């Protein structure tokens, strides 16, 4: 029974949940028992999210390898830079187009925001070095991020078996989170019913503005910011490669909503481009963790929308801190449907916003997630391919071998590109030495 339920598209189930929740919220707003579904769903997310974030970040950091003879270093720089620039763009857009959400009962459980810079820094440092076990129990995401980075760095020195155990633990908790997310349609029924019964249709319409802002920012980043990065690295017209990656990788990712499912597609596309197999065989799978520009946009915009709703003044310092925090914390979630939403409580804690308020915003995220998460996954997955190719072309340019990107893309479309394998790379090096 459950297997048949899981086989049904999550998008379809969420759409049905939205329709049912909206109808019940308008027709029978007095049926408060329906709200329990939303409370159960949010409660389950609150329980699993801290452990999920901890293991994902720790696992991703532990896998980093240095000294390998490939374009890996350039790819990592591009991945991290793209995630940071995406977060900065999201913060800038949030300042230009501030949005307020309607959160039922928000003012009753809001915490006071920190006032001065000294208080903010002291609070951040104190929270970051809290006991890691207590942090997992209490949902202290700053401490979770701090300890996962440190432990992940330490794990780089351990054996492959140890790293495999950590990876399998992360995969196990991810599977649990995925099972929880499978019940999102029921949670959405409860959340939407509660929102409509307490705030009316006008309050829910504000979610449409939030969705438009999220999607517009992601489109801007992929079609303006990322191409500019490609041009800086290659000094070639970036748009043939940009649009090609959207077509071959972004469109499938939009419908599957899973970066992990899209990895084979990206590997084949890299082969079609004639990229170095030794490089893309590592960078494409890692991109699911290290390259999370779409997730950083979601976290930044939804966190600032929450701050605006609560009347929290966001200083330039806190905004910049949010950019870095969103970029770092987004590492590891782009392979999970709806994973970026689980990072909102951590980012919201910067502004003294309670976990209860943040989880209400997570609920809103699942309501708009049919479109938001699809676009986010498309941006993340397509940019894995975009930056893997860019890194190799940039390194070739530095070595005095500029690449005709348009010709490469055209050849890839026809399947006539020359594939660069590790063996061919070694042969080329031997020829140069002779």
From Swiss-Prot:
One of its GO terms (biological process) is threonine transport. GO terms for molecular function: amino acid transmembrane transporter activity; symporter activity. GO terms for cellular component: plasma membrane. It is a multi-pass membrane protein. Pfam families: SDF. It is found in: Cell membrane. Residues 413-434 are annotated as: Disordered. Keywords: Amino-acid transport, Cell membrane, Membrane, Symport, Transmembrane, Transmembrane helix, Transport. Its main location: membrane. InterPro entries: Na-dicarboxylate_symporter, Na:dicarbo_symporter_sf, Ser_Thr_transp_SstT. The chain crosses the membrane at residues 14-34, 41-61, 72-92, 135-155, 172-192, 210-230, 282-302, 316-336, 351-371. It catalyses: L-serine(in) + Na(+)(in) = L-serine(out) + Na(+)(out); L-threonine(in) + Na(+)(in) = L-threonine(out) + Na(+)(out). Belongs to the dicarboxylate/amino acid:cation symporter (DAACS) (TC 2.A.23) family. Involved in the import of serine and threonine into the cell, with the concomitant import of sodium (symport system). This is Serine/threonine transporter SstT.
């Amino acid at each position: 029974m459950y297997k048949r339920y899981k086989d049904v598209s999550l998008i379809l189930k969420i759409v049905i949940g939205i329709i049912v929740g909206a109808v019940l919220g308008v027709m029978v707003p007095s049926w408060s028992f329906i709200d329990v579904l939303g409370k159960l769903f949010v409660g389950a997310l609150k329980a699993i999210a801290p452990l999920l974030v901890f293991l994902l970040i720790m696992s991703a950091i532990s896998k980093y390898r240095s000294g390998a003879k490939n374009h890996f270093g350039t790819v990592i720089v591009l991945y991290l830079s793209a995630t940071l620039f995406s977060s900065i763009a999201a913060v800038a857009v949030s300042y230009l187009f501030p949005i307020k959400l309607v959160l039922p009962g928000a003012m009753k459980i809001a915490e006071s925001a920190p006032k001065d810079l000294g208080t903010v820094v002291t609070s951040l440092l104190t929270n970051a070095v809290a006991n890691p076990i207590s942090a997992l129990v209490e949902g202290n995401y700053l401490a979770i991020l701090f300890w996962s980075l440190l432990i992940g760095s330490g794990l780089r020195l351990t054996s492959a078996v140890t790293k495999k155990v950590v990876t399998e633990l992360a995969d196990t908790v991810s599977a649990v989170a995925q099972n929880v997310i499978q019940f999102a349609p029921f949670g959405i029924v409860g959340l939407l019913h509660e929102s409509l019964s307490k705030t009316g249709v006008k309050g829910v319409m504000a979610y449409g503005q939030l969705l438009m802002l999220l999607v517009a920012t992601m489109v801007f980043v992929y079609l303006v910011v990322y191409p500019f990065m490609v041009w800086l690295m290659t000094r070639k017209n970036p748009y043939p490669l940009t649009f090609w990656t959207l077509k071959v990788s972004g469109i499938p990712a939009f419908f599957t909503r899973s970066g992990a499912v899209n990895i084979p597609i990206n590997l084949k596309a890299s082969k079609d481009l004639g990229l170095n197999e030794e490089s893309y065989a590592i960078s494409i799978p890692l991109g699911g963790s290290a390259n999370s520009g779409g997730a950083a946009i979601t976290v930044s915009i939804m966190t600032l929308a929450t701050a605006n709703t609560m009347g929290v003044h966001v200083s330039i310092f806190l905004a910049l801190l949010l950019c870095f925090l969103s970029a770092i914390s987004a590492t590891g979630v782009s392979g999970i449907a709806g994973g970026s939403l689980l990072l909102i409580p951590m980012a919201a804690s910067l502004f003294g916003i309670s976990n209860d308020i943040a989880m209400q915003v997570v609920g809103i995220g699942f309501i708009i997630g049919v479109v938001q998460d699809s676009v986010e996954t498309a941006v993340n997955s397509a940019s894995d391919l975009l930056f893997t190719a860019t890194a190799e072309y940039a390194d070739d340019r530095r070595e005095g071998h500029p690449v005709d990107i348009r010709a490469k893309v055209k050849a890839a479309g026809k399947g006539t590109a020359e594939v660069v394998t590790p063996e061919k790379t070694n042969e080329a090096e031997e020829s140069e030495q002779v």
